[in-house]
Protein backbone atom coordinates (compact mmCIF):
# COMPACT_ATOMS: atom_id res chain seq x y z
CA UNK A 1 0.00 0.00 0.00
CA UNK A 2 1.64 3.19 -1.26
CA UNK A 3 -0.78 6.13 -1.14
CA UNK A 4 0.03 9.06 -3.42
CA UNK A 5 -0.87 11.49 -0.67
CA UNK A 6 -1.33 11.05 3.06
CA UNK A 7 -4.54 12.54 4.45
CA UNK A 8 -4.91 13.98 7.94
CA UNK A 9 -7.92 12.71 9.89
CA UNK A 10 -9.03 13.99 13.29
CA UNK A 11 -9.20 11.27 15.94
CA UNK A 12 -12.88 10.92 16.98
CA UNK A 13 -12.08 11.04 20.71
CA UNK A 14 -10.36 14.43 20.38
CA UNK A 15 -12.64 16.02 17.80
CA UNK A 16 -14.13 18.41 20.37
CA UNK A 17 -10.68 19.58 21.44
CA UNK A 18 -9.62 20.06 17.83
CA UNK A 19 -12.72 22.13 17.06
CA UNK A 20 -12.02 24.33 20.10
CA UNK A 21 -8.46 25.01 18.91
CA UNK A 22 -9.62 25.54 15.31
CA UNK A 23 -12.18 28.13 16.40
CA UNK A 24 -9.49 30.03 18.31
CA UNK A 25 -7.18 29.97 15.28
CA UNK A 26 -9.96 31.38 13.08
CA UNK A 27 -10.83 34.26 15.41
CA UNK A 28 -10.53 37.62 13.65
CA UNK A 29 -8.79 39.24 16.63
CA UNK A 30 -5.97 36.66 16.46
CA UNK A 31 -3.21 38.04 14.22
CA UNK A 32 -0.55 35.35 14.67
CA UNK A 33 -0.20 31.84 16.06
CA UNK A 34 2.45 30.79 18.58
CA UNK A 35 3.43 27.13 18.54
CA UNK A 36 4.04 26.16 22.16
CA UNK A 37 3.93 22.37 21.94
CA UNK A 38 6.79 20.20 23.18
CA UNK A 39 10.07 21.67 21.93
CA UNK A 40 11.10 18.70 19.83
CA UNK A 41 10.46 16.88 16.56
CA UNK A 42 7.22 15.18 17.61
CA UNK A 43 5.92 18.32 19.31
CA UNK A 44 6.55 20.23 16.10
CA UNK A 45 4.68 17.62 14.08
CA UNK A 46 1.61 17.67 16.35
CA UNK A 47 1.31 21.45 16.08
CA UNK A 48 1.87 21.58 12.31
CA UNK A 49 -0.67 18.85 11.63
CA UNK A 50 -3.28 20.64 13.73
CA UNK A 51 -2.55 23.91 11.91
CA UNK A 52 -2.65 22.20 8.51
CA UNK A 53 -5.95 20.46 9.26
CA UNK A 54 -7.38 23.74 10.56
CA UNK A 55 -6.34 25.46 7.32
CA UNK A 56 -4.28 28.12 9.08
CA UNK A 57 -2.81 30.92 6.92
CA UNK A 58 -1.71 33.25 9.71
CA UNK A 59 1.96 33.98 10.58
CA UNK A 60 3.65 31.54 12.95
CA UNK A 61 6.05 32.05 15.84
CA UNK A 62 7.72 29.34 17.94
CA UNK A 63 8.16 29.13 21.71
CA UNK A 64 11.29 27.03 22.25
CA UNK A 65 12.29 26.37 25.87
CA UNK A 66 14.17 23.65 27.75
CA UNK A 67 12.47 24.08 31.13
CA UNK A 68 9.01 25.15 32.25
CA UNK A 69 9.85 27.37 35.19
CA UNK A 70 8.12 30.75 35.24
CA UNK A 71 11.42 32.45 34.40
CA UNK A 72 12.11 30.16 31.42
CA UNK A 73 8.59 30.63 30.03
CA UNK A 74 8.78 34.42 30.37
CA UNK A 75 12.20 34.45 28.70
CA UNK A 76 10.88 32.20 25.94
CA UNK A 77 7.93 34.46 25.17
CA UNK A 78 10.25 37.47 25.21
CA UNK A 79 12.43 35.81 22.57
CA UNK A 80 9.99 34.00 20.29
CA UNK A 81 11.52 32.33 17.23
CA UNK A 82 10.37 32.55 13.64
CA UNK A 83 8.59 29.25 12.93
CA UNK A 84 10.39 29.02 9.57
CA UNK A 85 13.53 28.09 11.51
CA UNK A 86 11.82 24.80 12.37
CA UNK A 87 10.51 23.89 8.90
CA UNK A 88 13.17 21.20 8.45
CA UNK A 89 12.32 19.74 11.84
CA UNK A 90 8.70 19.47 10.72
CA UNK A 91 9.69 17.84 7.42
CA UNK A 92 11.94 15.36 9.25
CA UNK A 93 9.07 14.46 11.57
CA UNK A 94 6.70 14.04 8.62
CA UNK A 95 9.17 11.77 6.82
CA UNK A 96 9.55 9.64 9.94
CA UNK A 97 5.80 9.38 10.51
CA UNK A 98 5.07 8.43 6.89
CA UNK A 99 7.95 5.93 6.70
CA UNK A 100 6.75 4.35 9.95
CA UNK A 101 3.31 3.93 8.43
CA UNK A 102 4.61 2.53 5.12
CA UNK A 103 7.02 0.05 6.69
CA UNK A 104 4.63 -0.90 9.47
CA UNK A 105 1.52 -1.60 7.45
CA UNK A 106 3.20 -3.27 4.46
CA UNK A 107 5.79 -5.37 6.26
CA UNK A 108 3.30 -6.37 8.97
CA UNK A 109 0.82 -7.58 6.34
CA UNK A 110 3.57 -9.47 4.51
CA UNK A 111 4.83 -11.22 7.65
CA UNK A 112 1.32 -12.06 8.82
CA UNK A 113 0.40 -13.58 5.46
CA UNK A 114 3.65 -15.51 5.00
CA UNK A 115 3.77 -17.07 8.45
CA UNK A 116 0.01 -17.24 9.09
CA UNK A 117 0.42 -15.48 12.44
CA UNK A 118 -0.17 -12.00 13.81
CA UNK A 119 3.35 -10.58 13.51
CA UNK A 120 4.12 -6.88 13.58
CA UNK A 121 7.03 -5.15 11.91
CA UNK A 122 8.39 -1.67 12.52
CA UNK A 123 11.19 0.52 11.22
CA UNK A 124 12.81 0.63 14.68
CA UNK A 125 11.28 -2.29 16.59
CA UNK A 126 12.29 -4.98 14.08
CA UNK A 127 16.03 -4.11 13.91
CA UNK A 128 16.00 -3.86 17.72
CA UNK A 129 14.34 -7.28 18.00
CA UNK A 130 16.92 -8.62 15.51
CA UNK A 131 19.76 -7.54 17.81
CA UNK A 132 18.12 -9.34 20.74
CA UNK A 133 17.54 -12.48 18.65
CA UNK A 134 21.13 -12.45 17.33
CA UNK A 135 22.50 -12.15 20.86
CA UNK A 136 20.30 -15.07 21.99
CA UNK A 137 21.62 -17.20 19.11
CA UNK A 138 25.17 -16.26 20.06
CA UNK A 139 24.55 -17.36 23.65
CA UNK A 140 22.83 -20.58 22.56
CA UNK A 141 25.72 -21.66 20.34
CA UNK A 142 28.47 -20.53 22.69
CA UNK A 143 30.94 -23.18 23.84
CA UNK A 144 33.15 -22.24 26.81
CA UNK A 145 36.91 -22.62 26.42
CA UNK A 146 39.26 -23.12 29.37
CA UNK A 147 42.11 -20.66 29.81
CA UNK A 148 45.11 -20.63 32.14
CA UNK A 149 47.27 -18.09 33.90
CA UNK A 150 49.96 -17.65 36.55
CA UNK A 151 50.37 -15.50 39.62
CA UNK A 152 53.67 -14.77 41.35
CA UNK A 153 53.62 -13.50 44.93
CA UNK A 154 56.71 -11.96 46.48
CA UNK A 155 57.61 -9.00 48.71
CA UNK A 156 53.94 -8.84 49.71
CA UNK A 157 52.83 -8.15 46.12
CA UNK A 158 50.88 -10.43 43.78
CA UNK A 159 52.03 -10.17 40.16
CA UNK A 160 50.16 -11.48 37.11
CA UNK A 161 51.85 -13.25 34.19
CA UNK A 162 51.65 -11.53 30.80
CA UNK A 163 52.36 -13.09 27.42
CA UNK A 164 55.09 -11.06 25.72
CA UNK A 165 53.69 -11.54 22.22
CA UNK A 166 49.96 -11.04 22.73
CA UNK A 167 50.00 -8.97 25.92
CA UNK A 168 47.30 -11.26 27.30
CA UNK A 169 47.35 -12.45 30.90
CA UNK A 170 45.97 -15.87 29.95
CA UNK A 171 46.70 -18.68 27.51
CA UNK A 172 44.42 -21.33 26.06
CA UNK A 173 47.30 -23.85 26.14
CA UNK A 174 47.40 -25.86 29.34
CA UNK A 175 50.72 -27.39 28.23
CA UNK A 176 52.31 -23.95 27.85
CA UNK A 177 51.03 -22.93 31.26
CA UNK A 178 52.46 -26.08 32.87
CA UNK A 179 55.80 -25.61 31.11
CA UNK A 180 56.18 -22.01 32.31
CA UNK A 181 55.25 -23.05 35.85
CA UNK A 182 57.92 -25.77 35.90
CA UNK A 183 60.58 -23.51 34.38
CA UNK A 184 60.03 -20.79 36.99
CA UNK A 185 59.80 -22.95 40.09
CA UNK A 186 62.78 -22.35 42.38
CA UNK A 187 64.18 -19.54 40.22
CA UNK A 188 64.67 -15.84 41.01
CA UNK A 189 62.84 -12.81 39.64
CA UNK A 190 64.22 -9.34 38.93
CA UNK A 191 62.38 -6.02 39.16
CA UNK A 192 62.65 -4.77 35.57
CA UNK A 193 60.74 -1.51 35.97
CA UNK A 194 59.03 0.59 38.62
CA UNK A 195 57.02 3.36 37.02
CA UNK A 196 55.10 5.97 38.98
CA UNK A 197 52.84 8.39 37.14
CA UNK A 198 50.56 11.12 38.40
CA UNK A 199 47.23 10.95 36.59
CA UNK A 200 43.89 12.72 36.55
CA UNK A 201 40.39 11.50 35.79
CA UNK A 202 37.61 13.85 34.70
CA UNK A 203 34.00 13.47 35.80
CA UNK A 204 31.62 11.77 33.38
CA UNK A 205 29.71 14.06 31.04
CA UNK A 206 26.28 15.45 31.82
CA UNK A 207 23.26 13.23 31.23
CA UNK A 208 21.26 12.87 28.08
CA UNK A 209 18.12 10.74 28.31
CA UNK A 210 19.75 7.53 27.06
CA UNK A 211 22.67 7.74 29.48
CA UNK A 212 20.33 8.58 32.37
CA UNK A 213 18.04 5.67 31.49
CA UNK A 214 20.99 3.27 31.42
CA UNK A 215 22.19 4.36 34.85
CA UNK A 216 18.67 4.22 36.32
CA UNK A 217 18.23 0.71 34.96
CA UNK A 218 21.58 -0.48 36.29
CA UNK A 219 21.23 1.10 39.75
CA UNK A 220 17.51 0.92 40.46
CA UNK A 221 16.13 -1.55 37.91
CA UNK A 222 13.96 1.15 36.34
CA UNK A 223 12.70 0.52 32.82
CA UNK A 224 13.42 3.16 30.18
CA UNK A 225 9.71 4.01 30.13
CA UNK A 226 9.65 4.39 33.92
CA UNK A 227 12.67 6.70 33.88
CA UNK A 228 11.13 8.86 31.16
CA UNK A 229 7.85 9.16 33.09
CA UNK A 230 9.69 10.16 36.27
CA UNK A 231 11.79 12.67 34.34
CA UNK A 232 8.65 14.11 32.76
CA UNK A 233 7.18 14.68 36.23
CA UNK A 234 10.37 16.34 37.49
CA UNK A 235 10.37 18.56 34.40
CA UNK A 236 6.69 19.37 33.97
CA UNK A 237 5.19 19.10 37.46
CA UNK A 238 8.00 19.92 39.88
CA UNK A 239 9.92 22.05 37.34
CA UNK A 240 13.26 21.19 38.94
CA UNK A 241 14.95 19.48 35.96
CA UNK A 242 15.27 20.56 32.34
CA UNK A 243 13.75 18.98 29.22
CA UNK A 244 14.14 15.19 29.38
CA UNK A 245 14.05 14.11 25.72
CA UNK A 246 17.51 15.34 24.80
CA UNK A 247 20.33 13.58 22.96
CA UNK A 248 23.01 16.08 23.97
CA UNK A 249 25.42 15.88 26.90
CA UNK A 250 26.54 19.48 26.54
CA UNK A 251 25.35 22.98 27.45
CA UNK A 252 25.29 26.12 25.33
CA UNK A 253 27.25 29.18 26.42
CA UNK A 254 24.10 31.11 27.33
CA UNK A 255 22.92 28.30 29.65
CA UNK A 256 26.42 28.12 31.16
CA UNK A 257 25.95 31.72 32.32
CA UNK A 258 23.18 30.50 34.66
CA UNK A 259 25.23 27.80 36.42
CA UNK A 260 25.50 29.69 39.71
CA UNK A 261 21.71 30.14 39.96
CA UNK A 262 21.20 26.43 39.27
CA UNK A 263 23.72 25.43 41.94
CA UNK A 264 21.99 27.73 44.44
CA UNK A 265 18.63 26.08 43.63
CA UNK A 266 19.89 22.66 44.77
CA UNK A 267 21.70 23.87 47.92
CA UNK A 268 19.56 21.68 50.19
CA UNK A 269 19.85 18.52 52.26
CA UNK A 270 22.56 16.10 51.13
CA UNK A 271 23.84 18.48 48.45
CA UNK A 272 24.47 21.55 50.62
CA UNK A 273 28.10 20.79 51.46
CA UNK A 274 28.90 20.19 47.78
CA UNK A 275 27.12 23.32 46.58
CA UNK A 276 28.89 25.38 49.25
CA UNK A 277 32.22 24.18 47.89
CA UNK A 278 31.24 25.10 44.33
CA UNK A 279 29.77 28.49 45.27
CA UNK A 280 32.87 29.53 47.25
CA UNK A 281 34.89 29.91 44.09
CA UNK A 282 34.38 31.06 40.54
CA UNK A 283 32.27 28.69 38.45
CA UNK A 284 34.16 28.28 35.20
CA UNK A 285 32.39 26.62 32.25
CA UNK A 286 34.67 23.93 30.80
CA UNK A 287 34.93 22.78 27.20
CA UNK A 288 34.25 19.28 28.47
CA UNK A 289 30.57 20.16 29.00
CA UNK A 290 29.98 23.51 27.21
CA UNK A 291 29.91 23.32 23.41
CA UNK A 292 27.35 25.09 21.21
CA UNK A 293 28.17 22.83 18.27
CA UNK A 294 27.13 19.70 20.17
CA UNK A 295 23.67 20.96 21.14
CA UNK A 296 20.96 20.60 18.50
CA UNK A 297 17.44 20.94 19.92
CA UNK A 298 18.08 20.76 23.68
CA UNK A 299 21.05 20.82 26.02
CA UNK A 300 21.93 18.15 28.60
CA UNK A 301 19.64 17.36 31.53
CA UNK A 302 20.53 19.62 34.48
CA UNK A 303 18.71 21.27 37.41
CA UNK A 304 16.62 24.38 36.70
CA UNK A 305 16.92 27.66 38.62
CA UNK A 306 13.79 26.79 40.61
CA UNK A 307 14.65 25.85 44.23
CA UNK A 308 13.83 22.23 44.96
CA UNK A 309 11.79 21.04 47.93
CA UNK A 310 12.95 17.45 48.38
CA UNK A 311 10.01 16.55 50.65
CA UNK A 312 7.64 17.07 47.70
CA UNK A 313 9.38 14.43 45.58
CA UNK A 314 8.41 10.75 45.66
CA UNK A 315 11.00 8.08 46.48
CA UNK A 316 11.57 7.28 42.80
CA UNK A 317 11.68 10.96 41.85
CA UNK A 318 14.34 11.51 44.51
CA UNK A 319 16.45 8.73 42.98
CA UNK A 320 16.40 10.21 39.48
CA UNK A 321 16.85 13.75 40.80
CA UNK A 322 19.85 12.56 42.83
CA UNK A 323 21.52 11.04 39.75
CA UNK A 324 21.14 14.25 37.75
CA UNK A 325 22.23 16.57 40.57
CA UNK A 326 25.35 14.58 41.44
CA UNK A 327 26.38 14.33 37.78
CA UNK A 328 25.79 18.10 37.42
CA UNK A 329 27.84 18.98 40.51
CA UNK A 330 30.60 16.54 39.56
CA UNK A 331 31.46 18.41 36.35
CA UNK A 332 31.87 21.59 38.43
CA UNK A 333 34.33 19.90 40.80
CA UNK A 334 38.09 19.44 40.23
CA UNK A 335 39.28 16.20 38.59
CA UNK A 336 40.17 13.10 40.59
CA UNK A 337 43.96 12.92 41.00
CA UNK A 338 45.93 9.78 41.79
CA UNK A 339 49.37 8.24 41.52
CA UNK A 340 49.58 5.08 39.46
CA UNK A 341 52.37 2.59 40.15
CA UNK A 342 53.29 -0.11 37.62
CA UNK A 343 55.86 -2.75 38.54
CA UNK A 344 57.25 -5.20 35.99
CA UNK A 345 59.14 -8.39 36.90
CA UNK A 346 61.27 -10.60 34.68
CA UNK A 347 61.77 -14.24 35.53
CA UNK A 348 63.49 -16.66 33.14
CA UNK A 349 62.29 -14.64 30.15
CA UNK A 350 58.70 -14.40 31.38
CA UNK A 351 57.02 -11.13 32.36
CA UNK A 352 54.82 -10.42 35.38
CA UNK A 353 53.15 -7.15 36.30
CA UNK A 354 51.34 -5.46 39.18
CA UNK A 355 49.47 -2.18 39.15
CA UNK A 356 48.00 0.01 41.89
CA UNK A 357 46.61 3.51 42.38
CA UNK A 358 46.92 5.82 45.37
CA UNK A 359 44.46 8.78 45.57
CA UNK A 360 45.99 12.24 45.88
CA UNK A 361 42.85 14.40 45.56
CA UNK A 362 39.37 12.85 45.46
CA UNK A 363 37.98 15.79 43.47
CA UNK A 364 34.61 15.03 41.88
CA UNK A 365 34.46 11.64 43.63
CA UNK A 366 33.52 13.53 46.79
CA UNK A 367 30.17 14.03 45.03
CA UNK A 368 29.69 10.83 43.04
CA UNK A 369 31.10 8.39 45.61
CA UNK A 370 31.09 10.12 49.01
CA UNK A 371 31.36 6.78 50.85
CA UNK A 372 33.76 5.21 48.37
CA UNK A 373 36.73 3.25 49.71
CA UNK A 374 39.68 4.60 47.77
CA UNK A 375 42.51 4.05 50.20
CA UNK A 376 44.39 2.69 47.20
CA UNK A 377 46.93 -0.07 46.77
CA UNK A 378 50.24 0.96 48.34
CA UNK A 379 53.13 -1.28 47.29
CA UNK A 380 56.24 -1.91 49.40
CA UNK A 381 59.24 0.05 48.11
CA UNK A 382 60.98 -1.82 45.29
CA UNK A 383 63.93 -0.72 43.19
CA UNK A 384 64.71 -1.57 39.59
CA UNK A 385 67.23 -4.40 39.48
CA UNK A 386 66.16 -5.74 42.86
CA UNK A 387 66.15 -9.54 43.04
CA UNK A 388 63.20 -11.46 44.49
CA UNK A 389 64.21 -14.95 45.56
CA UNK A 390 61.49 -16.13 47.89
CA UNK A 391 58.30 -16.09 45.87
CA UNK A 392 55.39 -18.45 45.39
CA UNK A 393 53.76 -19.43 42.12
CA UNK A 394 50.09 -20.19 41.66
CA UNK A 395 48.37 -21.57 38.59
CA UNK A 396 45.00 -20.00 37.78
CA UNK A 397 42.32 -21.10 35.38
CA UNK A 398 38.88 -20.15 34.20
CA UNK A 399 36.44 -20.52 31.33
CA UNK A 400 35.34 -18.03 28.72
CA UNK A 401 31.82 -16.75 29.23
CA UNK A 402 29.08 -16.11 26.69
CA UNK A 403 28.02 -12.54 25.98
CA UNK A 404 25.50 -11.28 28.52
CA UNK A 405 21.85 -10.97 27.57
CA UNK A 406 20.68 -7.44 26.95
CA UNK A 407 19.31 -5.46 29.87
CA UNK A 408 17.22 -2.39 29.12
CA UNK A 409 20.32 -0.33 29.84
CA UNK A 410 22.62 -2.21 27.46
CA UNK A 411 19.87 -2.40 24.83
CA UNK A 412 19.52 1.38 24.92
CA UNK A 413 23.25 1.67 24.31
CA UNK A 414 23.02 -0.80 21.41
CA UNK A 415 20.13 1.15 19.85
CA UNK A 416 22.20 4.32 20.12
CA UNK A 417 25.14 2.70 18.34
CA UNK A 418 23.85 -0.32 16.37
CA UNK A 419 26.56 -0.34 13.67
CA UNK A 420 28.64 -3.08 15.30
CA UNK A 421 25.56 -5.32 15.44
CA UNK A 422 24.93 -5.11 11.67
CA UNK A 423 25.22 -8.57 10.11
CA UNK A 424 25.93 -7.17 6.64
CA UNK A 425 28.63 -4.55 6.23
CA UNK A 426 27.09 -1.50 4.56
CA UNK A 427 29.25 1.63 4.78
CA UNK A 428 26.46 3.95 3.63
CA UNK A 429 23.92 2.57 6.11
CA UNK A 430 26.52 2.64 8.89
CA UNK A 431 27.32 6.28 8.17
CA UNK A 432 23.62 7.19 8.17
CA UNK A 433 23.05 5.45 11.51
CA UNK A 434 26.01 7.26 13.06
CA UNK A 435 24.88 10.64 11.75
CA UNK A 436 21.28 10.20 12.91
CA UNK A 437 22.06 8.80 16.36
CA UNK A 438 21.15 5.15 15.80
CA UNK A 439 17.80 3.36 15.97
CA UNK A 440 14.89 5.51 17.11
CA UNK A 441 15.32 8.67 19.14
CA UNK A 442 15.77 9.42 22.82
CA UNK A 443 12.03 10.13 22.85
CA UNK A 444 10.91 6.85 21.22
CA UNK A 445 13.35 4.17 22.43
CA UNK A 446 11.59 3.71 25.76
CA UNK A 447 8.27 3.03 23.97
CA UNK A 448 9.91 0.59 21.56
CA UNK A 449 11.51 -1.42 24.38
CA UNK A 450 8.25 -1.35 26.35
CA UNK A 451 6.38 -2.62 23.29
CA UNK A 452 8.84 -5.45 22.70
Put a short name on every predicted segment.
Residues 1-420, 424-428, 433-450:
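Toprim catalytic domain recognition across nucleic-acid enzymes
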Amino acid sequence: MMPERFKLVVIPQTRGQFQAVKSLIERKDVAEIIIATDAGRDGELVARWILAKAGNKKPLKRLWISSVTDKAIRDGFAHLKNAKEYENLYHAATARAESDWLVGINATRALTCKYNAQLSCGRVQTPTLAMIAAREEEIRHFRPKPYYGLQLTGKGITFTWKDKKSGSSATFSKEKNEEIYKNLSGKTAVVAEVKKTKKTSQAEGLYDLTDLSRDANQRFGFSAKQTLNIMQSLYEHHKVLTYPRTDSRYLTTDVAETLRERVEAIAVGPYRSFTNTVLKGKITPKKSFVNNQKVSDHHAIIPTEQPVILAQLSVDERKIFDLVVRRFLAVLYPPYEYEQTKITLECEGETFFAEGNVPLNRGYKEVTAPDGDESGKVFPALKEGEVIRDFSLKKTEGKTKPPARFTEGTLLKAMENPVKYMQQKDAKAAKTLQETGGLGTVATRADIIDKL
